[in-house]
From Swiss-Prot:
UniProt organism field: Paenarthrobacter nicotinovorans
Family: Belongs to the drug/metabolite transporter (DMT) superfamily. Small multidrug resistance (SMR) (TC 2.A.7.1) family. NepA/NepB subfamily.
Induction: Is transcribed only in the presence of nicotine under the control of the transcriptional activator PmfR. Forms part of an operon with nepB, folD, mabO and purU.
Record's bilayer topology term: Multi-pass membrane protein
Family annotation (InterPro entries): Small_drug/metabolite_transptr, Small_multidrug_res
Functional description taken from the UniProt entry: Component of an efflux pump responsible for the transport of nicotine breakdown products, in particular methylamine, out of the cell. This pump apparently serves as a metabolic valve for nicotine catabolites and may protect the bacteria from the potentially toxic side effects of these compounds.
Protein name per Swiss-Prot or TrEMBL: Nicotine metabolites export pump subunit NepA
UniProt KW Transferase keyword: no
Swiss-Prot/TrEMBL keywords: Cell membrane, Membrane, Plasmid, Transmembrane, Transmembrane helix, Transport
Domain of life: Bacteria
Localization terms from the record: Cell membrane
A molecular function GO annotation: transmembrane transporter activity
Length: 116
């Protein structure tokens, strides 16, 4: 990942992965809120999204928003889709597979471009 401070890239990756994990966990918990009618899952979702955005804000001190957000959104989207299939019995077709492959390809391409 391209950074404004060289060596700090090593500290950005763990923060980015934590931000993605918090966002994925929050998104995965959303159905349990029952439209924000259940207090505990709603509070958990709000806290996890707060953590995700706070970490993203810290990451943006050291890297470009276009790269960081694309990686966050792409990897988060792919992760939520996989979690949906594995744990929520959601459908998965060849169209889903192609879409996820395109997302992953986009993330890899952005990463390669950022390294130049």
């Amino acid at each position: 990942m391209q950074t404004r401070y060289g060596r700090r890239a090593l500290t950005i990756w763990p923060l980015l992965l934590l931000a993605i994990a918090a966002e994925v966990a929050a998104t995965s918990l959303l159905p349990q809120t029952n439209g924000f009618r259940k207090l505990k899952p709603t509070v958990a979702v709000a806290c996890l999204y707060t953590v995700a955005f706070a970490l993203l804000a810290q990451i943006l001190k050291f890297t470009d928003i276009g790269i960081a957000y694309a990686l966050w959104a792409g990897l988060g989207t792919a992760s939520v889709a996989v979690i949906g299939v594995l744990f929520r019995n959601e459908r998965f077709s060849w169209k889903h597979a192609i879409g996820l492959a395109l997302v992953v390809t986009g993330v890899v391409t952005l990463n390669l471009q950022a390294g130049q």
